[in-house]
């Protein structure tokens, strides 16, 4: 069993998104049927990087930013291992950004789990590479002057073949993403949106609860229309180089 009561209680703040994600990962791996002795969970440094301590598998917490490099080595050394890399947005995209893009470019068969809360939590609240422009933090008291990384763009820019995004509080959706990543042969990047309840609470309020997701999130399913809203009454339409929201059934003079 990948989950064991002997592993102790996670040392995360109450309400941290890491709790939700850990439960989803335990459940997904159990449903996939992976064997603990054929699974390795590798992390860097950060709050989310404590996750390997709560896995009844081969597990290793490495040095800051090097989880992708160690994960690559594990997979190349033993191709039969199911390798799961866990990194936060700071660990994975700042000090570990170089390893992140090259693991994707090489298309190594590892699962890269990027837990994105748009903040450095372990070091007490500095802005990260995914913090939005103008974000006020301990290291940017007047607001950041930088534009953030979008992990999906980085992944596709590095010629990635698999990218998925989910919300930590959406257990079923997260589970489906993790199982799809496990079944993909090659580098699979999963971005998990979550709150840091101490230093960046509310950053994903628009999709963090069930009602918010019904209004603002699109569940992409192969062969099905991209609809959202409480009654699936909204869709997306291309407009120039971007997208715009349209309400189904309303006549658009531009497209008649």
Protein language model features and the residues they cover:
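Flexible, low-complexity linker and terminal segments
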Residues: 7-8, 198-254
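Conserved thiamine diphosphate
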Residues: 128-183
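Short coil/turn connectors at secondary-structure junctions
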Residues: 8, 35-39, 77-83, 105-111, ...
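ATP/pyrophosphate-binding catalytic subdomain of soluble kinases
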Residues: 161-219
